[in-house]
């Protein structure tokens, strides 16, 4: 695998290969490759806890040496372009770049680089490692994707997770549907929009999305009514109680407790939210291994 940029660039067989490797790392069946003497740099131009820290943990477990990069103290503050920043790191011997950026498809500007890129999120475009860890979590639960009914609720228009998961899960045979306020509908995605209360007792997976305040502008955030949103589109106790016995709840996090999901349900028996985070490290180990081997 040359790069990991978008779920649309991965075949189903490549997806299965990556989650199989990740599951084997997790179970201990597969010995960890050690990339001693190879260097990685994580370039995060947007805030991150889970993605950044799990990439760092994955890199350390694989023996990579981390070249620290902080946007606030870099020449980006002097106007250096993303390409020149990345080309500089390549020139000094970095072997892999992990990049999160607010610009959709930022990687299209980097096609002259000669080292692999792992996309850790581009604007509202794609978040392939999040999608892959979600797929891994679903696979551990169900063993397949064909015919699964998956409801994705929330800020569809601004969510790179919704976009990535829509493409990958439909390709794998799942039935994806959305529930969202009308102002956050994305008409470029062909999944049907439904009322959450009409399907909550029929779905296998409820995937909740964070409200993307940073992409709504000041007026959008000021006019947001958290309790009203929670009652209309969030996972309330009443909705949780209607879920099928074997259904699971997912969220890419960070979670706005009491908005997308009732706080007490974040760690309820059907929740796999922290399992997603655990799987993220193993999945990113699999991605790094595929990019460097």
Swiss-Prot record:
Its EC number is 2.1.3.2. It catalyses: carbamoyl phosphate + L-aspartate = N-carbamoyl-L-aspartate + phosphate + H(+). Keywords: Pyrimidine biosynthesis, Transferase. GO terms for cellular component: cytosol. Pfam families: OTCace, OTCace_N. The keyword Ubl conjugation does not apply. It is an enzyme of class 2 (transferase). L-aspartate binds at residues 78, 160, 210. Carbamoyl phosphate binds at residues 50-51, 100, 127, 130, 253-254. GO terms for molecular function: amino acid binding; aspartate carbamoyltransferase activity. InterPro entries: Asp/Orn_carbamoyltranf_P-bd (IPR006132), Asp/Orn_carbamoylTrfase (IPR006130), Asp/Orn_carbamoylTrfase_sf (IPR036901), Asp_carbamoyltransf (IPR002082), Asp_carbamoyltransf_Asp/Orn-bd (IPR006131). One of its GO terms (biological process) is 'de novo' UMP biosynthetic process. The keyword Glycoprotein does not apply. Transmembrane segments: none annotated. Pathway: Pyrimidine metabolism; UMP biosynthesis via de novo pathway; (S)-dihydroorotate from bicarbonate: step 2/3. Catalyzes the condensation of carbamoyl phosphate and aspartate to form carbamoyl aspartate and inorganic phosphate, the committed step in the de novo pyrimidine nucleotide biosynthesis pathway. Belongs to the aspartate/ornithine carbamoyltransferase superfamily. ATCase family. Heterododecamer (2C3:3R2) of six catalytic PyrB chains organized as two trimers (C3), and six regulatory PyrI chains organized as three dimers (R2). This is Aspartate carbamoyltransferase catalytic subunit. It comes from Staphylococcus epidermidis (strain ATCC 12228 / FDA PCI 1200). The lineage of its organism: Bacteria, Bacillati, Bacillota, Bacilli, Bacillales.
